[in-house]
Design a protein with these regions (language model features):
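Conserved substrate/cofactor phosphate-moiety recognition/catalytic segment
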Residues: 36-84, 88
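Small-molecule kinase domains that catalyze NTP-dependent phosphoryl transfer to phosphate-bearing small molecules
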Residues: 122-125, 130-178, 185-196, 201-202
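Residue-level preference for the first positions of well-ordered beta-strands
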Residues: 18-20, 48, 92-94
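Extreme N-terminal, non-catalytic leader segments
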Residues: 1-21
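ATP-dependent NMP and nucleoside kinases share a basic, alpha-helical "lid"
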Residues: 58-67, 71, 83-141, 147
Length: 206
């Protein structure tokens, strides 16, 4: 007897399908701020949602990794694997990482391509530096932080993201509203359709 739980059953129970919203952007672009507010809005709707970011990944799962290009790639690979497990369990995962290299983003997408949504949190380097309350950019320019994205290491913008959120011209609230609309179409509507189909099957199509 198979006592497994299907993705369709999870979607019906949760009211949405699982998904990975992969936020990519410069430090200071607004990734974590948007991620946390979006998580709150989705949680208030009763959705299964969780944020993965440097705060909860670097202190535990990836505490053995540094910031070399190789370690950064491995950091994202591990996050991608964890996000895929969450998504396959029916959770909406919001991953907020700089993810500067296209190849690394392609690698993460390849782990769970049917669940992956590439969200570019866009802001100019100048705007990000102005928002930098921790002084990270100043330290990077002084040579105190090596391989700092945007200063001494490149950021390759996504070529075909699913959404671009320009945080220089949009408020955090406006960005979240755009994401909620996107989630409704991409993750909630498929679950609604499943519910309609299951109701029709149960009623014999009446």
């Amino acid at each position: 007897v198979d006592f497994g739980v299907t993705p369709e059953q999870r979607s019906l129970a949760n009211g949405h399908t699982g998904g990975i919203l992969w936020f990519s952007g410069l430090s200071g672009s607004g990734k974590s701020t948007i991620a946390k507010l979006l998580q709150k809005r989705l949680f208030d709707k009763g959705y299964q949602v969780f944020v993965l970011d440097g705060d909860n990944i670097r202190k535990g799962l990836n505490r053995d990794l540094g910031f070399s290009p190789e370690d950064r790639a491995e950091n994202l690979r591990r996050v991608g694997e964890v996000a895929a497990l969450f998504a396959k369990a029916g959770v909406i995962v919001i991953s907020a990482f700089i993810s500067p290299m296209r190849e690394d983003r392609r690698m993460v997408r390849s782990i769970a391509p049917n669940y992956f949504h590439n969200i570019h949190i866009k802001a100019s380097l100048e705007a990000c530096e102005k928002r930098d309350v921790k002084g990270l950019y100043a330290k990077a320019r002084a040579g105190e932080i090596p391989e700092f994205t945007g200063i001494s290491a490149p950021y390759e913008e996504p070529q075909n993201p699913d959404i671009v959120l320009d945080t220089e011209n949009l408020s955090v609230q406006a960005c979240v509203e755009q994401l909620l609309k996107y989630i409704d179409v991409q993750l909630v509507e498929p679950a609604r359709n499943l519910e309609i189909e299951s109701t029709q099957d149960y009623s014999g199509g009446i």
